[in-house]
Swiss-Prot record:
The gene is psbM. The chain crosses the membrane at residues 6-26. It is found in: Cellular thylakoid membrane. Residues 31-52 are annotated as: Disordered. Residues 42-52 have a biased composition (Basic and acidic residues). This is Photosystem II reaction center protein M. GO terms for biological process: photosynthesis, light reaction. Keywords: Membrane, Photosynthesis, Photosystem II, Reaction center, Thylakoid, Transmembrane, Transmembrane helix.
Length: 52
């Protein structure tokens, strides 16, 4: 089956753009895998006041 260069470019962009976007989001987070959902010390806490 023959493919055109347009099809190859479209497939590459279809995979590459979301991958680069997600890697950029991961790198831009300061905590890495830790998020505010699991940690009360991060911004965006689930409760308005921290537990004492």
């Amino acid at each position: 089956m023959e493919t055109t260069s347009f099809g190859f470019a479209a497939s590459l962009l279809f995979v590459g753009v979301p991958t680069i976007f997600l890697i950029g989001l991961f790198v831009s987070t300061s905590d890495g895998e830790k998020s505010s959902f699991y940690s009360d010390t991060s911004k965006g806490r689930l409760s308005p006041e921290p537990k004492k």
